[in-house]
């Protein structure tokens, strides 16, 4: 996990690696996930390819997921859920 604070600490960009413990988000289209308010899945890196996700994009085991959020306290990929 990596954390970057931006805009005077009002916004954070975080990077997570999807694993089996993230089963609540794996394989489901982003449009079907109940994401936290004020959170954006900005990019997914899969097999060295960067994906700018859309609603039909899924998060798969081993993906590196970059999220941008106003929320704090996100420690695990499943914390992106509302």
Language-model features and meaning:
Residues 15-82:
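Cytosolic Rossmann-like ligand/nucleotide-binding regulatory domains
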Residues 1-18:
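Long, charged amphipathic helices and adjacent flexible linkers at domain junctions
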């Amino acid at each position: 996990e990596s954390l970057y604070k931006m805009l005077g600490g009002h916004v954070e960009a975080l990077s997570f690696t999807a694993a089996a413990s993230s089963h609540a988000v794996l394989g489901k289209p982003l449009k079907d996930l109940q994401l936290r308010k004020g959170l954006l899945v900005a990019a997914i890196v899969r097999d060295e390819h960067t994906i700018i996700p859309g609603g039909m994009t899924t998060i798969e085991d081993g993906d590196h997921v970059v999220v941008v959020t106003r929320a704090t306290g996100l420690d695990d990929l499943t914390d992106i859920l509302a």
